[in-house]
Amino acid sequence: MEESDEPEQPISLGRQEYRRRRLPSQPMVDKSQQTEIGEKKKGMAAVQPPAPKATHSIGNIPGGKANYSGKEYESLILSSQLQQTWMKRKQGQEMTDKSFQTDTSVEEKVEVIFMDKALEENSASVGEIAPASPQGVSEVEIPTSRPPSLLIDRAQQTSCTGDWSLISICSKDKVDKEQQTYFSELETTVKSMPGSSLIKSKEETVPIAEDGSLVEIDGSLEIEVLSTEKIPDVVMSFTEGEISGELQAVPDDEATVKAEHFFTEETSIQAPSLAKETSAAETTAKTPKEFVDIQALPADELSSTEPPADIRPPLVKGTLSEEPSDQQYPKGTVVAPSELPVEDLVPLSEEVLEKVQALAIDTILDDSGRAESTTVEEATGEVQPPLSEEITKEVPAEVHLPIATHSKEIVIIIDKEFAIDEDFEDQPPFITEVAEDEATAEVQPPSAEDAPEEVAPSEVLPPPTEQGTVEHMTAEVLSPSTEVGPAEVPPLPTEEWPLPPVTEESPAEVTPPETEEGPIEPAEEGPEDGLLLPTEEIPSEVQPPSLEKVPLEEVVIPQAEEVPLDDLPIEVQPLPAENIAGWVPDEFQAFPVDEYPAREDTVEVQPSSLESAPIEESSVEAQLLAAEADTAEIEETPTEVAPAEDQLLPAEEVVLKVEVATAWSPLSELPPAEEATVEAQLTSVEESLKRTSVDVQPPPLDTLAEESPAVKQPLKTDVVPMPEFPGEEMTAQDPLPPSVKTTVDQDLLKEHQLPEIADISQVKLEYTTFTGDKKSKGTDSVPEDVTGIKDDQISTFKIEGTIKIELKNSTS
């Protein structure tokens, strides 16, 4: 019985266990996690009947019992296996679900990682397939930098949906933008490629073929976009070199359009900042667009306008990029390296220009012997770009900003006031037709390009601005002064003139006269001689002809030359006024006094021709007298301006000199409150001006000193203050030793520097008061106001003036 009981017990137990396990096996199958419970039940079954367990193990051996036991065992095994299989299946299903999620996300991440590799591979393949391999490679490089960041960012945000949405959207964008920009295509192809990373090879081959075809078809357009985007993003000299090459490969129209778009972007960016600073900057921001439009139209008109348009875009590249970069540099001085490579681009673009100009010259020859003007432009443009580079290196940011703005505004004014067509009619008819549009565009882009050199044209414009646009000059002087700030503000009224001269040092100063003469009267002589000679001989040659031809322009030149001091003060602001007075005064007083007297003679010619300009200067003189104490510190720089003002207002000069001699010590005591504040600026600004002027101006002063006799001779007849000028020269020669001469020179210097200082405060006030009045009153009314201002400022500025003047006198 025991035996029977024993087997029954295990059978019954086995059945019970089987049933038990069988019933829960269903929910266990449903609930895959209950496998552990089943195993526990196995353990429980074995534990509950310990004896039957042994019998069960023994029963496995016997046959009859082994059936049940074997079945039960198999059932147990099957149940466990089924449970495990169900678990695996469910887990597999879950894994599949998760694989779509997590696995795809991981794969997508890997794809993103591969995207860079794929892009690199594509770049190599595209470089092979694409006609322009370096362009394709660079293009691929750009998207590699951008799209992976986007994909990685969105991959971090959303594992699957973000990337897939990107991929789908990218495919759509790809379809939409393939024809538009090759860069977007690269982005879309790169993104779409990770979309199907498993099929990378296929997709890679496909987009490569697409890229090749696209490059072949729209290579120019694609290259354009890439060039424009690459420069602002990377600002790499390598990319710039490629850009120049791309521009060369790209048709002239496209190249011009590229340069236009690129510069419009930069200029628009820079112009808004300037527009924020001044309405004049707004006009400049508008003008570059207008010029770009004008250039685009000439680019379309390859025959007549294209050479200047081509010349402009490349030159404008160098210049605009330089100027905008300069403008941006003062703002965000980071882009400096880009400016240098851009300058490097300028010669490359010049070569491209030469080629394009040669082609355009052929078309122009067909049009009407316009190749001459083009050659003149080429010579001027070619000669100028290096000058622009040098000048930009010397005084890039500060000079270019006011020059670009003023030159642009002046260009508009020149179009209105000066018949550029007439001026260029003297030049080949090519400029005559394109005169207004391209003359403005050429003058401005060059001004933007060479800002110093063709800032000479811009100066040419500023002198006309002095003549016809003295109103604009007043308004611009106010706005540029607001742009530049108090330190630059005084120079800005003169900056329009001095910026180019400062940038070009003396030849640039001379260049404006010739460019003035060139664009205004002798367009042919101006651009060729003015641009080529300005660096070398123009000071002497240009000024005499400019005095003979256009005393106003020449007057503008002396002003511009005088203003270099103002312009220099901008850069030179950091330099202490005392140091400047120490080492600069001798050079400045000696040279500027000798040179600028002639200039002032020319300036006197200006007063005669441009009463408004003398009025401004007279108002500036009033301010100068008021700030003469300060100018005593800045004697060096003011000596240049002072002779001009003294010559402008001989009566005032006598009065000013007498007042200076009599009240010079009080004037030294009298730095006007405005000048006191402005002096601090001017001291720093003028100190920098003095150093820069000593560096920059002394050569122009030497050349101008040579020119001054010629200029003096023609102007002496017109200029009453010429006797004062020799006195000034004597003071300039003995500026510091003789107290009287030093006072006169210091007064003159003060007057010149005060035009900077007082030009900031009083010139603005006087611009507000005299803008309408100066034009009507002329220089005579200004002396009255100047004397009144002198008296007022003398009384107000005694304390500060004495301190500063004493320091400078001690230093000098």
From Swiss-Prot:
Modified residues (Phosphoserine): 25, 57, 125, 133, 184, 273
GO molecular function annotation: calcium ion binding
Low complexity composition-biased segments: 275-286, 502-513
Subcellular location: Cell projection, Cilium, Flagellum
Bias-annotated ranges (Pro residues): 488-501
Region (Disordered): 1-66, 269-333, 367-388, 424-547, 672-741
InterPro entries: FSCB
GO biological process: negative regulation of protein sumoylation
Protein keywords: Calcium, Cell projection, Cilium, Flagellum, Phosphoprotein
GO CC, alphabetical: sperm fibrous sheath; sperm principal piece
Keyword presence, Disulfide bond: no
Composition bias, Acidic residues: 514-528
Keyword Calcium: yes
Oligomer and partners: Interacts with CABYR.
Function summary: May be involved in the later stages of fibrous sheath biogenesis. Binds calcium.
Name of the protein described by the UniProt record: Fibrous sheath CABYR-binding protein
Taxonomic path: Eukaryota, Metazoa, Chordata, Craniata, Vertebrata
